[in-house]
Amino acid sequence: MNVIQTIDAEQIGKLAEARAVPDFKPGDNLRVSVRVTEGERTRIQAFEGVCIARSNRGINSNFTVRKISYGEGVERVFPLYSPNVTEIAVTRRGVVRRAKLYYLRGRRGKSARIAEAARETNAD
């Protein structure tokens, strides 16, 4: 590994200790809690929607979440290892066959739904 990759690995290790990053894929419903500063006040804001893309680039990894708010589509890109992202929770697992779900942008209503993954059971 070169120097930059070593530094990236160290930083990812430090950030992973502070906050657990769940295993999620495009198609999953996520609730992302973000620290928002307005003036001198700081609060936690939740953004819940479908993960439509994930880019794995080491410390620069990010993911895109899409939701429909008051009839308008809203997308937000979150850096995976940002200190402003306080929590990422998977609320529902989806089954898709694509890595990027940009086709959901052109769909409305029932055609924009994603099938839910079957629950995994540990049968002994």
Swiss-Prot record:
InterPro entries, A to Z: Ribosomal_bL19, Ribosomal_bL19_CS, Ribosomal_bL19_sf, Translation_prot_SH3-like_sf
Family matches, as Gene3D superfamilies: 2.30.30.790
Pfam hit, one: Ribosomal_L19
GO molecular function per UniProt: structural constituent of ribosome
Keywords annotated in UniProt: Ribonucleoprotein, Ribosomal protein
Gene Ontology CC entries for this record: cytosolic large ribosomal subunit
Domain of life: Bacteria
The keyword Transmembrane helix belongs to this UniProt entry's keyword annotation: no
Record GO biological process: translation
Signal peptide extent: none
NCBIfam families assigned: rplS_bact
Similarity comment: family membership: Belongs to the bacterial ribosomal protein bL19 family.
Function noted in UniProt: This protein is located at the 30S-50S ribosomal subunit interface and may play a role in the structure and function of the aminoacyl-tRNA binding site.
PANTHER family to which the protein is assigned, alphabetical: LARGE RIBOSOMAL SUBUNIT PROTEIN BL19M (PTHR15680:SF9), RIBOSOMAL PROTEIN L19 (PTHR15680)
Protein name (database record): Large ribosomal subunit protein bL19
Underlying gene: rplS
